[in-house]
Amino acid sequence: MTDETAKNGPDAAADAQIEPQVQEETNSTAEDAGQDNNPTAALQAENAELRDRFLRLAAEMDNLRRRTERDVKDAKSYAVTAFARDMLAVSDNLRRAIDAVPAEAKEEAQAGLTALIEGVEMTERAMLSTLERHGVRKIEPEGQKFDPNFHQAMFEIPNPQVPNNTVVQVVQPGYTIGDRVLRPAMVGVAKGGPKAETAQAADA
């Protein structure tokens, strides 16, 4: 067999297939070796990865801190919610007792009755002041536009003199605690008057 025949035989075809694979593996090995021989690049890549992890962890910790602060603040602000709501019933009863005494009777009352009335009024003021120190605020809606977030409409009163949906009577005062409604104010609202926008334009 001549040399030319050997070059064109089956072995030559096999060698032709193997050579690209060997060359590719050689190139890959060379690239890996190049990376292994460049410690600076490896350290930079590792540093970038660690920095990314650190930033993510810092962001998570900051979010956790904010949530914790908010939860603690809410716990402090609204811890007395149930107690305050119960005390509102006591305050209502004190006010009813005061209002039950006619004005004429107050004027003509003897010293003992006058002292009793003043004592009940003082107790009511002290209770409301204590609730206020704990974030409970009284809603004073008379004359304001009806707001379903803070007011509960009990009835309508025909009144063409004031803008429609204006609170003209307070049946039971409402209260808020922090940013929340502890109890909506029960009110009567006007109907038959001009719309609020029209009334404001007329005033302007």
Swiss-Prot record:
Entries under Pfam families matching the protein: GrpE (PF01025)
Species this protein is from: Allorhizobium ampelinum (strain ATCC BAA-846 / DSM 112012 / S4)
InterPro entries named among the record's database cross-references: GrpE, GrpE_coiled_coil, GrpE_head
Keywords per UniProt: Chaperone, Cytoplasm, Stress response
Disulfides per UniProt: none
CDD domains listed in its UniProt record: GrpE (cd00446)
Name of the molecule in the record: Protein GrpE
UniProt xrefs under PROSITE patterns: GRPE
Region (Disordered): 1-42
Lineage: Bacteria, Pseudomonadati, Pseudomonadota, Alphaproteobacteria, Hyphomicrobiales
Cellular component GO terms held in the UniProt record: cytoplasm
Signal peptide feature range: none
BP-aspect Gene Ontology terms: protein folding
